[in-house]
């Protein structure tokens, strides 16, 4: 038989050129722990999320990063179109977070956030609703459709609050409860 080199050789049957088989993309959901950075490059002594993945997944890119102090749902893939559809602001994908604050959020501050707080990179607005929990006071559900760098933390800080806990529980169609106790899961 003949040997074909993909990308160099073409195969034609009855003057019709066969197309290369579409590349199968990889999609992985990860439950990122606090303390890990979403970068391939080591940043000081902080471990990266890639330290949690096997060697054959090191090529995957992160859609919608989380900062070192945050935890929760990440999607890693080698599908650039998927990353674009999930992260570009024009697609307005829903993101849901559980946020802990250093003190109770008053109604005036809640309304300000929902109307929009002016930050150095523009207005930041999102929905904030209290989560009922005696065990974990000052917990809130945040729903947003954009995701600028440290936006939730900066928005609360502008109003005199500190974020003590930040966990993404939903990103587009994906939810953290799909992971149960796993660090990552192929989807």
Predicted stretch roles:
Residues 1-187:
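Basic, flexible Lys/Arg- and Gly-enriched helix-loop patches that mediate nucleic-acid binding at interfaces
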């Amino acid at each position: 038989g003949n040997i074909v080199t993909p990308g160099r050789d073409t195969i034609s049957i009855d003057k019709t050129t066969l197309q290369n088989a579409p590349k199968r993309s990889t999609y992985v959901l990860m439950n990122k722990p606090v303390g890990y950075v979403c970068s391939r490059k080591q940043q000081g002594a902080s471990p990266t999320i890639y330290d949690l993945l096997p060697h054959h997944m090191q090529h995957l890119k992160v859609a919608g990063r989380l900062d070192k102090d945050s935890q929760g749902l990440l999607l890693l893939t080698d599908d650039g179109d998927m990353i674009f559809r999930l992260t570009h602001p024009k697609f307005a994908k829903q993101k849901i977070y559980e946020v802990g604050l250093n003190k109770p959020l008053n109604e005036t501050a809640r309304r300000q956030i929902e109307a929009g707080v002016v930050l150095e990179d523009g207005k930041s607005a999102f929905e904030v609703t209290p989560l009922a929990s005696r065990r974990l006071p000052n917990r809130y559900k945040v729903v947003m459709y954009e995701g600028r760098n440290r936006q939730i933390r900066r928005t609360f800080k502008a109003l005199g609050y500190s974020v003590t806990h930040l966990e993404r529980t939903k990103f587009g169609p994906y939810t953290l409860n799909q992971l149960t106790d796993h660090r990552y899961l192929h989807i």
